[in-house]
Amino acid sequence: MSVQEVNTHAVLPPIVSRNDKEFLESIQRYITTETKRVGCKEEGPADEYYTIYRNVFDKFSATDRKIIFQVIDYVSAYKSILTAIKKEYDAFIETIKKGRRTAFYLHGKLKVLAKEPTALVYHQRRAIQLEAKMRIIENNSTAIQLQIDQMKQLRMEYDKKEVKLCAPSRQLWKPIPGMTLQDSVNLEALNKHKQYLEDKYIKLKQDMSTMYVPAQKKAELDEEMVVLLNRRDIAENLKKDRQFRHQRLQVISHTLTPWMKQNMRISFQDVMERIRKTKAIYGYDNIVDEIFEDDPNKKKEAIVMLHYIERFNDLISLGEYERAACFAANSPKRILQNTSTMNKFKAIGKIRGKPLPLLLFFEAIFNTSQAFKRPINADLTMEGIKCGLSEERLDLVTHWVTQEKLTFSEKAGDIIFAYGEQHTYHKPRCLALAQIIYNECGLHRKALLCLCKQGQIHEAMEHIQQSKDINTDDLIQLITACPQIDLIRCLTQERNEKPPFLSFGLAVLHMFSVDMKKVGMRLLQEVSKGEKDVIEHLVMSDLFCSLEKWQEIANICLQNGFKILFNDIMSILRSQAGVSEISEDDTTNIMEHVFW
């Protein structure tokens, strides 16, 4: 085969050795791994690609040092060529980055230059507006300055006129009054006129000391006059009082003198009738009425009471509500402890930052009630309790009730009871207060309800045992208002070998009839836990529940799933002599033997 024939054949590609292939694959894996780690896309940011490919050739990098050494060791003949390629690659990348930074800077500068004409127009327009405002301000300042100058000029002219008016108008050349022109130049005539004026001055001075008094003296005389008039009024009142007493004693003397002379033969009642006839004959109406009056100081007391009322109204008008409340509480005969005074305080309403005036009034009158040895009436008591509870002052109401400063009534207890039902936190204290009031009023049923709601079941049982007014209907109402299992259990159990206070059967039937099925179910559940002997004793010892009603209870047990209890009750009922079960479809007449 010739050389030409050999050259005409296709050239085969160089065969890559296994080591070269592994080396290239390791470099490719590094590039792929770094690209994925950075998160570059195929069209991703060039900066990140530059960094990755540069690290491939960076022989000073710690992570890629082994790779580049392998390349150099593997192809040591191309070391200078690879180094040159790397430098050229780095220079190319830096040139591209620098070009980008320059383009970004120039682009921003171009935008600024493009906006300069618009900004210039805006600045010029703003300068024109400010110049217009400055002209307006200057014009206003000029006008104000002109007004100030005019006012100064007017003030100067006014001061000049005032000086001219205040100038002395005395004229020395005016002739002397009472003298002619010739006498005014004559020395003797002038001496005589001087002596005349001196005598006149002395006389006027004497007249001032005798005929005139100063204004201070007049004020002193007026005060003395008022004192004398008050003394006169007091003397006149004393005179009238003594005249009245004299007339009264005279009437008594005219009547009793003959009676004493007759050795008191006439009864004293006839003497009193004569005094009354004296009233009709002589017209001594006021005198005779005063004789039979129990309180001789009634007029003085009326004056004192009137003064108290006026003083109270003054305190209200001045806004001194605390002093007014104390004044009303200490008023004589409690004239200010009434509903009209309460309405005055109620009309004031609430004052921000101060206690309620109405509460101050009630607090004052309740605190002084023991001083009068008589509690406040029922109407004011209820209003006071309402006021205290509305202001959330249960502590005050507790103090009033426990210290017996109130008039206890059923309505007062109901108010406190209702407040406790609405406010769960204060319910125990309200129930205790209501119980005190109900006990004082003799309302044992409501007091019993308060005990039960407080959970004092044993005290309630003792209360029922001691009270004779509580009957079965009252107990039914009690368990309706307070459906507690412990209460019903105690009421339906025997105590000291005595029958229970309430029938168990009636209690169960009542619970189911008033939509308290849960309570009735719990009662049946407790009974079903007992043995048949206990159930039989319960049925047979129940004197108030008939056998027909126990059959109703058995039907209720069957309807609610207590089948065993149903069977026990029915077997107990069937075991009774003369008792037979009648079905609903049976038409047998029970009273047939009576009519035939």
From Swiss-Prot:
Record keywords, A-Z: Coiled coil
Coiled-coil ranges from the UniProt annotation: 129-241
Record's keyword annotation contains Coiled coil: yes
Highest taxon listed in the record's lineage: Eukaryota
Disulfide bond sites: none
Pfam families with a match to the protein in the record: Clathrin_H_link, TSNAXIP1_N
InterPro entries named in the record: ARM-type_fold (IPR016024), Clathrin_H-chain_linker (IPR012331), CLHC1 (IPR017212), TSNAXIP1_N (IPR032755)
SUPFAM superfamilies xrefs: ARM repeat
Gene3D superfamilies referenced in this protein's UniProt entry, alphabetically: 1.25.40.30
The protein, known as: Clathrin heavy chain linker domain-containing protein 1
Organism of provenance: Mus musculus (Mouse)
